[in-house]
Amino acid sequence: MKKLLRSVALVSAALVIAASARAEEKKVAFDNKDAIAGWTVTGDVAVDPAKTRPDGAGGSLKIGPGGKAFWKLGDADLSGKVEFWVYEDGKAPADPKAHAYGSLWGVMTADGHALVSGAIYAPYLGGDTTYAVGEFNPAKGGDLPSLKCQYLGLDRAVGWHKWTFNMDADAGLTILVDDKDVNGTTPKSRFDWNKTDLPGISTIVFMGDATKDAAQTLWVNGLTVAQGPAMKAKLAPPPPPPPFLPEKDPAAAEGPAVKYVAAMANQHPRLLFTAERIPQLKAFYNSPQGKTYREQMEGYVAGCTVPEDRKTSPAWGQEYGLFKIPMVALHYVLTKDHASFEKSVAYLKWLAGTADWTEGGEPAVADTPEAYAKVMEKLKGLGPYDERNSDTTASFTMVGASLTWDWLYNDLDPAFREEFRQALWEHARVMYYGGHKSGNPEGGYWRGVPAYNHRWFRDWGLTLAALGAGEGKPEEQWLLSEVEKELRFMWDWLPSDGSQHEGPSYGSSAGGLGMAFGVSDDLSGTHYLDAPFFRNVGTYTMETSASGMTETLRFADSAGGGKGFGCNPFFLKTAAMYKQADVMDGIRHALQLDAGKWGTVDSAWEPIIFDDPSIKGGHYANLPTSVFLPDLGISITRDSWQEKAVAAMFKCGPMGGYKANSWRPTHKEAGGGLPYLNVAHDHPDANSFIILGDAEYLAETDGYCEEPGKLSSSVNTILINGLGQVADGRPEGDVWQQPGGGDMTEMGKITAYKELGDVVVVEGEAAGSYIAYSDAKTKRSRPAIDRFRRTFIWVKGGYILAFDDIRSTKPVEITWLLQGAKLEPVNEAEGRYRLAKGDAQCEFQLAADVPLKSKIGVSTANDHSKLLNWQQLQASAEGTAARYACVVDPWHKNVKVTLTPDGPDKATITVSGPGIADTWRWEAAKGKFDAATWHGSRRRGFDITVDAKTAVPPAP
């Protein structure tokens, strides 16, 4: 009997223990709003008691676009089983290959790390039709589940589906869909818990569609949760992938050996200057001409110390690699200041003790050869990860490290000097193997493409480190020859006019590429700086500056509303090479004006090296007041170089420019398609213009736009049925512009250009940017239009005239746009308005040959997602054709415009005002890209004809 009682007691105890270990099951029926009491809810989230599934019970939880619903189960990451039904509607964004996510569902840890499935989009996923599992932190801006994911390959079948996340305390996480393991009959063929960072479950996660199209609504029904005990199983991640860096490079290089110029072999310093030039640099540094740079440098070096956190990454890697490290090193060269020498050595030892130059932050190591050797072995053994040691931060760090090692070469301890030389060489190898040869998983956006700032930036550090640390030895030949091939590829696809399709803000990347070219020319005898691009880049920089040189004539991704000059001091060197005294004077003037600005005050080492004080006598006021940039289809005019001058820019060209686009047919993909070209920073702005006067922007443009994306509604152009310009196969409004699948060179094209002294006429055709398109988000659609011809006429001291000829085969709504910081009506009946900013203002008048419905709205223009709140005239017409004529009055001449049509293909435009009675007779172009015929006249003034014969635009 005692044995029986003892047995019963033992069984009872076991049952109690088992019951306590087993979770209490919780069910949520979503019958009323109290069902989510205690949840963390944001955005479009609601309980719908009437929404259910066939054979289901209770209502459903609705999570609309942007909504979030988190149910925190506790503070610990435990085992447990989570089951629910979701309704899959199959909807997807227009561009499912852009990194984004639609509706998501899953589980999360106590520290906010979520594991989710649902509609996950990326170039390497099929998120529009299949599922993946992704991990991210929903609270961390920029983090996305596509960045760490496992592909399930399961179809997104429309309908209700049961999802189970079973976190077993002994075995880890299993995922089931409709009660079937996502791994099917082959374990771990798709999902492997050990590849995740999810040790247990604390929270249940439901998130709404976050794509631009925001078309998906998530419905959740029948939620059941059973929390279990603490996890016994621990994540056992697979071993890291093997390092991508081979022990040795290939023995033989393709092509001729890279030989160092005799005067440079085994000589230091040799990067950017030699020992023979140091006396000249010192003289300039101590001269009145060098005073600003000297004061900048002396004021800056005090803060040049190794950071306490030992991170290389502040300011995108620029703070140390491009600013502080080279600044203090050059200060030592020029002054022999012992403190600056010690700071420079400390920088080198910091980097010698750091394997990861992308982030840094590694603990300090002993100052011994053995410790540095271990760091070197760590570097060589690093496996693929993101863009570690192959991103811009790593490259910028290589720039500063290479220059400092080279400039201080003769004063460094010989043993440490050799250790650091090896570090530079190995970092160059890692940059090339990890970046250019795809050893790291990320970086596809810049690999293989020409004319892109990210590639130029990487080539900067790669070249200085490889050529600076190398000597042309047999074992170095392969990498040196690869570097030369890389530079040649960049050289081959530079536009001749010195322009950059990414906008004037990216002049720093051209300066970086120029330094790489210059080092190659100096050390190995190439002639890359002989490229027409570098003959013209200084002029381009000046011409894309506003007349006061405190800001740029903005296009593409430029800082909206901010002041700044888009010049790299390296262009002083190229201007000196080509004896461009006026350009040099302009750059010098701008660097003085912006002396205290970020990116200038911290770059004083550059103008000290690159200026040539022997070139004198120039004046920027002698620079041309009208210029045409054929690669981008840009016309720039100004009435002088005075600060309050009137200036205008007209743009009609393909995204990426003609030169980069000409590369695509030469590198077709296996199936015959055109390859990817990075146009991420280009804007949909064909046939747009800006106007400045009285030292202010009057007709404004977009900034460095992010949300709500790159839109034609942010610039001075037109919309068709409310939709702007798109590339073939791409949606409107991407944050990072993507190339069309077909030829982009006909999206925008200059059809005529004529400079006639005080009169400049430029004409562009942009119908190719208004292809047939349906927007998944707004449900708007439009047919392709036949013509969007805009003529932009500059009459110096008088007015600016814009004339549009717009045609479609089907009736459409045409919306004509013009925006400024402030816009107010003067006489709406006459179409007269006033643009204003600060103390500057000018009036304009708009006429058309069809009835207009005009209103003043707010532009979508933004700068880093902050709306600029430009006020925008939106003048709409309906039909198959419309002609608009707009006269802008920046010289305050009180001019007026009249438009008199003569059938569909002819019109007369008159511009009148005190002392002005001009007539412009227009006859439409015959062919797609033929020039229209214009005859303009002013009594006792000009009498000009512009047509296909007299106004052929300069070739790109």
Give residue spans per PLM region:
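Extracellular carbohydrate-recognition regions
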Residues: A23-D44, E83, K232-P239
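Aromatic-lined, polymer-binding surfaces characteristic
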Residues: R270-I278, K282-T539, A546
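Extended polysaccharide-engagement surfaces of secreted carbohydrate-active enzymes
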Residues: Y506-P956
